Amino acid sequence: MGSVLVDLQIATENIEGLPTEEQIVQWATGAVQPEGNEVEMTVRIVDEAESHELNLTYRGKDRPTNVLSFPFECPDEVELPLLGDLVICRQVVEREAAEQEKPLMAHWAHMVVHGCLHLLGYDHIEDDEAEEMESLETQIMQGLGFDDPYLAEK
């Protein structure tokens, strides 16, 4: 199995309590499970203002969100090992973890896994897509040593 090369960008004032680059690489590799060569992606950890602006610009949602995924798109004849970019909002992840009574690092891992699956083309708009994606997220999270992230909802 290959690995995921992560360009980690920290764009938040408070860096205390953030996951390490090694953790993010481990979680992304667990989600992507690249075969052969490395694949590359960017993970940008931001504050609410940047998340809000990006969510409004690209999704028409007037609020910050936990994770945004921007898959890399290139012509079919061009083969580059680029997955795309994840933008994760520190404050939203921390708030959700507290509200859902989940360990903070487990929720960070879930957001990386969830975002990576979006980069791979998975979605959760339709119920059947959501079930497939949630099932895959659960398998990946358990493979990484975490509990089912949807346990409280079941």
Curated annotation (Swiss-Prot):
Zn(2+) binds at residues 114, 118, 124. Its cofactor is Zn(2+). It comes from the Bacteria. PROSITE patterns: UPF0054 (PS01306). It is found in: Cytoplasm. Binds 1 zinc ion. GO terms for molecular function: metalloendopeptidase activity; RNA endonuclease activity; zinc ion binding. Its EC number is 3.1.-.-. Belongs to the endoribonuclease YbeY family. This is Endoribonuclease YbeY. It comes from Haemophilus influenzae (strain PittGG).
